[in-house]
Amino acid sequence: MEFIDKRPFLEQEQKLDVEFLKDCYNEDTQSFYPSVNTDQSYSNFSSKKYRKSIAGWENLLLQEQHDRCCYCMRRLKSSALNIEHVIPRNLKVNDTHVEFTKYTENSKWLADNVELDSDFAKRNFKSVQDIEKVNKFPHRIALANLLASCNGKFEEVSSGCCCNNARSNDYLLPLMLMPEVKERIVYDGISGAVAIYPQDESWVKMLQTLNDDTYKEIRILWHKIWEFNQELDIETVRDYPLKDRIMFFKKIFNQDNFENIPNEYHKYTGLPNGDSTYWNLLMDFDWFFTYKWR
């Protein structure tokens, strides 16, 4: 996990948010349709017109995150991603203002650029021009509040998002939007585990997901690759055929006999049937080759 610095993209984010709000604005009633504090508002914002074009907001989020999942750092593909609201669309608490403040108190970015949708809905806009002056957007559609996450599936591309679903609508300290995340998130190359220091109760469930055996195996492998040769051309490694993958694993495990490598890692080479699914999955996590292992 790393700090997602959205600041260089703020102008583009606000331009897309303003465009959507202006399209929803009815000058006769001086109101928005659909209302900004409804699920239909986000549903409309997610339509192809706003989200999927080359200049759409999905591509913008991918640029901001360098095509990486905001949680596990897997390389993102448009066919296998989901959108994460840092401040959930539907705050499942009695006092939404208190819950909202828990996020903004911990992230200056959210405090400066996002407004609770129910508060925004009470604002009075006399004209379309008034919308152009907005600098805090309703949290359901504020791009400042949106991140991209992977689908969390290891064996096949499918809908849904494991990372996202692990969190649901529960409060989660917005570490990805906090510069100090680099010091707080620690990956252990020996066990493959990820931990947060100091511990944070809101992350317990998410860390259980991120410490799934497959995630840990992948981190262990990347730590071994990093230890073996930090000057490798990973793009060349990515294209290795099965025979070269086997030789590569023998090197990183320092074994002359492939059978001496623990069985759980064999699948990452493509054995026994030449299936490259797990090899490709491993390569999707090449961010860990650049991680400063401790």
Predicted regions and their residues:
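Long, low-complexity, intrinsically disordered segments enriched in glycines and aromatic residues
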Residues: 137-139, 144-151, 155-221
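C-terminal, charged low-complexity interaction regions
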Residues: 195-294
